[in-house]
């Protein structure tokens, strides 16, 4: 099954962290390092210097160096006005390094004294998802969406997709579908929601309804990756490997370096008897990946004999 890998990629990158830090630097130096009433020692010059170091490190993709600089900045001025932004970005760095437990702890600490920090709320949901804490995630999303805080449509959709995936893993299929239908209430042609509904309905045996949802997704958004992935999946389940291959190749044009998709393409080519194309795909994969994919490729090479 090719679908799950496409749905919930890690949403945190160094570039994303860099973008989030820009508002911090856009503030005046006075605002960035202005303290609240405190007796804690301050070194404003060192604070600014470490924040600039963090900014430069992120531009160079050095997450560990950026984290050290941000931690040092917090030590130089513990009560500066911009510190919550720095703490949030430390959590994002930990997420980018896939240190989910540590990131979750930082986000919970931040939310303990800034419970209205919207970006941190969503980042915590992403953390819980990546850590496999599905029950906590589903409840956290319910809590966030019940607080009537003003959120962007994208934020709400992010939370609902995370909840839907968590509920699917918990085998709470109706709850998963409910989350997806909530997406459609604000975006009636959302390709991802229609596609995931289609997959769930098909698995439950509601073939015709599933194909209607898939058709809506592919018609309205022919280049949507989730729609193409589900489309390939359902075509293969229907026994239509030609259509499955067409959709998979369309998806590969959008994700040309996706090796697991390339392996699946080689498998479909072999199933369809297109041995020369399959061999070229396998040889290309072996040349690019070396021994990394040897175990996966060996059975496919055996089929060429």
Regions found by a protein language model. Give the residues of each.
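N-terminal leader/linker segments that initiate helical-solenoid repeat arrays
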Residues: 19-89, 96
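Helix-start (N-cap) detector for alpha-helical repeat units in TPR-like alpha-solenoids
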Residues: 47, 81-84, 118-119, 152-157, ...
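Structural marker of alpha-solenoid helical repeat scaffolds
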Residues: 76-79, 113, 147-151, 186, ...
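Structural signature of tandem alpha-helical TPR/SEL1-like repeats
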Residues: 62-68, 97-106, 132-143, 170-182, ...
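Canonical tetratricopeptide repeat
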Residues: 85-89, 123, 158, 162, ...
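Terminal, low-structured helical/coil segments at or just beyond the last alpha-helical repeat
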Residues: 271, 276-305
């Amino acid at each position: 099954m090719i679908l799950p890998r496409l749905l919930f990629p890690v949403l945190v990158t160094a570039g994303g962290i860099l973008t989030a830090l820009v508002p911090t630097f856009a503030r005046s130096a006075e605002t960035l390092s202005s303290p609240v009433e405190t007796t804690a020692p301050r070194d404003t010059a060192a604070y600014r210097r470490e924040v600039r170091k963090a900014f430069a490190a992120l531009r160079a993709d050095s997450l560990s160096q950026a984290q050290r600089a941000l931690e040092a900045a917090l030590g130089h001025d513990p009560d500066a006005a911009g510190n919550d932004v720095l703490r949030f970005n430390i959590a994002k760095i930990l997420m980018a390094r896939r240190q989910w437990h540590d990131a979750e702890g930082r986000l919970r600490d931040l939310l303990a004294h800034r419970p209205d920090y919207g970006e941190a709320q969503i980042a915590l949901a992403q953390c819980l998802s990546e850590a496999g804490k599905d029950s906590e995630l589903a409840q956290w999303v319910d809590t966030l969406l019940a607080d009537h805080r003003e959120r962007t449509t994208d934020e709400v959709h992010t939370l609902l997709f995370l909840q839907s995936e968590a509920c699917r893993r918990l085998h709470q299929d109706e709850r998963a579908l409910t989350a997806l239908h909530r997406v459609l209430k604000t975006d009636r042609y959302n390709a991802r929601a229609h596609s995931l509904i289609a997959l769930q309905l098909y698995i439950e045996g509601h073939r015709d309804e599933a194909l209607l949802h898939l058709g809506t997704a592919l018609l309205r958004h022919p280049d949507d990756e989730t729609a193409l992935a589900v489309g390939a999946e359902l075509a293969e389940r229907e026994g239509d490997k030609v259509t499955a291959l067409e959709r998979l190749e369309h998806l590969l044009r959008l994700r040309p370096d996706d090796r697991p998709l390339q392996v699946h393409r080689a498998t479909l080519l072999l199933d369809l008897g297109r041995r020369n194309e399959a061999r070229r795909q396998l040889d290309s994969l072996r040349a690019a990946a070396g021994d990394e994919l040897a175990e996966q490729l060996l059975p496919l090479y055996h089929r060429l004999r």
